[in-house]
Amino acid sequence: MDAPRRDMELLSNSLAAYAHIRANPESFGLYFVLGVCFGLLLTLCLLVISISWAPRPRPRGPAQRRDPRSSTLEPEDDDEDEEDTVTRLGPDDTLPGPELSAEPDGPLNVNVFTSAEELERAQRLEERERILREIWRTGQPDLLGTGTLGPSPTATGTLGRMHYY
């Protein structure tokens, strides 16, 4: 007899909640939006924490390249090569590699360009951007200066120091 009582209690509580929602839709909407915002905020916090706790990837050394002139017909035993090149590092030993800055969020001094042309192109682009920023900073043309624009026959086609063609 306890099971039907629980079923009736669940039904009664559900009907009471439905009646409350019907009577106060603003309250329901507020709680719903509050729950969604809280869930998004919690998700954002967990995402930030997981990113900040993630280990930073270590840069790999230069890839080993095979000599293209070597013949591939000769049988090579890769297992023996791997066993011969394995070395154990002590506590004071370090791996050779590019020196990185001590700041974890600072800029890395690693050349990302593979050719001189790409480097030159990037430098020219940087110079253009610097010139545009300098032009923008030194001042904009005076748009409220003399000159008229419009359908009148005396219109000069200029507005301030700018000329529109």
Curated annotation (Swiss-Prot):
Residue positions, PTM Phosphothreonine: T85, T148, T158
Keywords in alphabetical order: Membrane, Phosphoprotein, Transmembrane, Transmembrane helix
Acidic residues biased stretches: 74-84
Region (Disordered): 57-109, 143-165
Membrane topology: Single-pass membrane protein
Keyword Membrane: yes
GO cellular component: membrane
Subcellular locations according to the entry: Membrane
UniProt keyword annotation of Magnesium present: no
Parts of the chain that traverse the membrane: 29-49
One Pfam family recorded for the sequence: FAM176
Family affiliation: Belongs to the EVA1 family.
PANTHER family: PROTEIN EVA-1 HOMOLOG B (PTHR48422:SF2), PROTEIN EVA-1 HOMOLOG B-RELATED (PTHR48422)
Name of the featured protein: Protein eva-1 homolog B
Lineage of producing organism: Eukaryota, Metazoa, Chordata, Craniata, Vertebrata
